[in-house]
Swiss-Prot record:
Pfam families: PNP_phzG_C, PNPOx_N. The keyword Hydrolase does not apply. This is Pyridoxine/pyridoxamine 5'-phosphate oxidase. It is an enzyme of class 1 (oxidoreductase). It catalyses: pyridoxamine 5'-phosphate + O2 + H2O = pyridoxal 5'-phosphate + H2O2 + NH4(+); pyridoxine 5'-phosphate + O2 = pyridoxal 5'-phosphate + H2O2. FMN binds at residues 59-64, 74-75, 81, 103, 138-139, 183, 193. Pathway: Cofactor metabolism; pyridoxal 5'-phosphate salvage; pyridoxal 5'-phosphate from pyridoxamine 5'-phosphate: step 1/1; Cofactor metabolism; pyridoxal 5'-phosphate salvage; pyridoxal 5'-phosphate from pyridoxine 5'-phosphate: step 1/1. Binds 1 FMN per subunit. One of its GO terms (molecular function) is FMN binding. Gene3D superfamilies: Electron Transport, Fmn-binding Protein, Chain A. Its cofactor is FMN. Homodimer. The lineage of its organism: Bacteria, Pseudomonadati, Pseudomonadota, Alphaproteobacteria, Hyphomicrobiales.
Amino acid sequence: MSDTSIQQQSQLTSGDFTAAENPFALFAEWFADANESELNDPNAMALATVDPDGLPDVRMVLMKGYDTDGFVFYSHIASQKGRELAANPKAALLFHWKSLRRQVRIRGAVSAVTETEADDYFATRPKQAQIGAWASKQSQPLESRFAFEQAIAKVAARYLVGEVPRPPGWSGWRITPLRFEFWHDRPFRLHDRIEFSRDTPAQPWIKTRLYP
């Protein structure tokens, strides 16, 4: 590693994040930094679930909101992720911000957002994306791209004028954290890691520093 790289990392870690006591506040700080430094989708997160056989699944989704109740994303209820979350409402998230040499891991319980929340968010989506949500049978076999484009055209014709309502099979989920882990790269793999954990959302956080 060059002296320049080491100096850059030293600048990134000039504030001791391991002194933080509130994981949500620390996430907010890091996410604000990511919004300034990441070129593409700082709200992108890996979502891990398991199927009924216990086989893990992971995919990238976009976080559409967060607060102390949890982290929210949206998709089709009948999708692979939707079916897996219905069978086992627990999940893990990973945010990786390469430009900052940071990552945040989150594990917790999953619950559905309210109908009002889903409606309100769906109304903010571009109309073409709303139409796509109606046309797509996410995770189901697709005969051809042409078949999908035909389905899109039919939905577009149906909603040529006026607002597009939210499909009944499209909604969102909230992951309420029971565990956070904040990781920051250091020179020579001597990284900093801290974990916040609790058994239930009503309990206070327990902070632990971890070996890299």
